[in-house]
Design a protein with these regions (language model features):
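Juxta-kinase regulatory segment immediately upstream of eukaryotic protein kinase catalytic domains
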Residues: 1-29
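A conserved alpha-helical element in kinase catalytic cores
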Residues: 54-94, 107-123
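A glycine-centered beta->alpha junction motif in the catalytic cores
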Residues: 95-109, 147-150, 236-251
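A cross-family kinase active-site recognition segment
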Residues: 106-158, 176
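Catalytic-loop of the protein kinase fold
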Residues: 178-180, 185
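Helix-rich C-terminal or lid/interface subdomains of diverse kinases
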Residues: 213, 217, 221-266
Length: 266
């Protein structure tokens, strides 16, 4: 997720598991980039031009869904890193992708976050009715189902699964659309008026409110209900989606959810 302390980072050396990079002639790996808790992300260059190389753990169908989505969004004005195809025109090779390096800084205050909210609204409007990502499930489906995407409610203690589902219930109203799924400072770059959303690995179809759940409290969002309930839903989602993949982070988020509910009554 977006917490720099969470998750398991693959510290593979640049020479290990990168043979597929030969499909992009002249691309040289430089160093790991921050984040990459579930996927390895490297800074690279070709002929002096900076690039980003990522290895995705998603299935081919789930990765193709992500890349189709990003093409659709760029056509509608949502800034996202531009994919660099292989020399023979493929979008990825066994989960390895190359994209342009996006300049910018992370959001620094309410004005930046308001621009992020505006960009998210464009994303949600542009994807109403979009098909669900293969293998994933929306929070509404997971009120009954045990798993979907990275969520493994069936692997949690029953009391934790009940807590998570109860936190999701108040946010189920509204349209279904694509949500980025991991909106936080490290996944947003601001460059003047341009706001770029990075790392769409956790994108899915759900109610739009999850993308606003963990934004700073002082930032106004389109969510029409109680802000404490929205934050509880976001903390519950992070607990559920990280339970298996990032267990230390998930349990930290669970503790935060308990504290939040005690203090707010949400």
């Amino acid at each position: 997720m977006t917490d720099d302390e969470g998750g398991n980072v693959d510290d593979s050396a640049p020479g290990e598991g990168w043979s597929g990079l030969a499909a992009w002639a002249g691309v040289e790996l430089l160093r790991p980039l921050p984040g990459g808790h579930r996927n390895v992300v490297m800074l690279a260059e070709r002929a002096g031009v900076p690039l980003v190389v990522r290895r995705s753990i998603r299935s081919r169908a789930a990765l193709d869904w992500e890349l189709d989505l990003l093409e659709h969004l760029r056509d509608r004005g949502v800034a996202a890193p531009e994919l660099v195809p292989t020399d023979d025109g493929r979008r990825h090779v066994d989960g390895m992708l190359v994209s342009e390096f996006v300049p910018g800084r992370h959001p620094a205050g309410p004005a930046d976050w308001r621009r992020v909210v505006d960009q998210l609204a464009v994303l949600h409007t542009a994807t109403t009715g979009w098909p669900q990502r293969p293998g994933f499930a929306a929070s509404g489906m997971l009120l009954d189902a045990g798993r979907g995407g990275d969520v493994r409610l069936d692997a949690m203690p029953a009391s934790v699964a009940r807590l998570v589902r109860s936190a999701w219930l108040p946010v189920q109203q509204g349209p279904r659309c694509v949500v980025h799924g991991d909106v936080g400072p490290t996944n947003v770059l601001v460059d003047g008026a341009r706001v770029t959303l990075l790392d769409w690995d956790e994108a899915r179809v759900d109610v739009p409110w999850f993308d606003y759940a963990l934004l700073p409290d002082e930032v106004t969002t389109p969510w029409p209900g109680d802000r404490a309930q929205l934050r509880a839903a976001g903390l519950a989602w992070e607990t559920a989606t990280c339970w298996r993949a990032e267990p230390v982070y998930a349990r930290r988020r669970l503790a935060e959810l308990h504290r939040h509910r005690r203090h707010s009554g949400a």
